[in-house]
């Protein structure tokens, strides 16, 4: 399976890193981090995003967001699934309105036109009517809208356990088997 992980410049970059860390090793992963993602990672978490990604998944293929001619920008390359974690509202708007001027939005547009799973984890609060309309437009185009919302029923005691719940739910939405969180009724 081939999966693209897009990392936009929204708050919550550690969630993308946890997704990358927990992704099963047999999945071929392609990563595109926006310029703003690198800035936000450093400002919010003191993380050098380039180094962190390579440390977590040395076998991944990394692309520059401006490399619009990359293999993953074409439907014929055969990417199976894509996740954008976190998804800024700027990125959401670009995808919702068909703008593909960078590799993340172009790859997302390809997923929509090819009717392949595209998971979007929007990071913003509160949401304006415009933001909600853009998310609704994407949902109507079969994108999976999966914001990182906390859980209480798992009784998570650590930040890592909460992150694992989110990553596990995202994996579930993408059809990736996992045991990252306790299932309801399975205790």
From Swiss-Prot:
In its keyword annotation, does this UniProt entry include Hydrolase?
Answer: no
Q: Which domain of life is it from?
A: Bacteria
Name the InterPro entries for this protein: Flavin_trans-like, Flavoprotein, UbiX-like
Among SUPFAM superfamilies, the record links this protein to: Homo-oligomeric flavin-containing Cys decarboxylases, HFCD
Looking at its record, which EC class is this enzyme?
Answer: transferase
Q: What are the entry keywords? A: Flavoprotein, FMN, Prenyltransferase, Transferase
Name the reaction it catalyses: dimethylallyl phosphate + FMNH2 = prenylated FMNH2 + phosphate
Indicate which residues the UniProt annotation says bind FMN: 9-11, 34, 123
Report whether Ligase shows up as a keyword of the record: no
> Which protein family is named in the record?
Belongs to the UbiX/PAD1 family.
Name of the molecule in the record: Flavin prenyltransferase UbiX
Species per Swiss-Prot/TrEMBL record: Helicobacter pylori (strain J99 / ATCC 700824) (Campylobacter pylori J99)
Q: What is the lineage of its organism?
A: Bacteria, Pseudomonadati, Campylobacterota, Epsilonproteobacteria, Campylobacterales
Gene that encodes it: ubiX
């Amino acid at each position: 399976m081939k999966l693209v992980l897009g990392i936009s410049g929204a708050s919550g970059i550690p969630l993308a890193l946890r997704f990358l860390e927990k992704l099963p090793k047999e999945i071929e992963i392609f990563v595109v981090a926006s310029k703003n993602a690198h800035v936000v990672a450093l400002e919010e978490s003191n993380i050098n995003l380039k180094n962190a990604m390579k440390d977590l998944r040395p076998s991944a293929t990394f692309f520059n967001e401006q490399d619009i001619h990359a293999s993953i920008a074409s439907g014929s390359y055969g990417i199976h699934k894509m996740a954008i974690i976190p998804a800024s509202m700027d990125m959401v708007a670009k995808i919702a309105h068909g703008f593909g001027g960078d590799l993340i939005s172009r790859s997302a547009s390809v997923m929509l036109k090819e009717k392949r799973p595209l998971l979007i984890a929007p990071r913003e609060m509160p949401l304006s009517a415009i933001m909600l309309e853009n998310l609704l437009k994407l949902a109507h185009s079969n994108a999976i809208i999966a914001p990182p919302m906390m859980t209480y029923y798992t009784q998570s005691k650590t930040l890592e356990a909460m992150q694992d719940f989110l990553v596990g739910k995202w994996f579930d939405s993408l059809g990736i088997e996992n045991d990252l969180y306790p299932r309801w009724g399975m205790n």
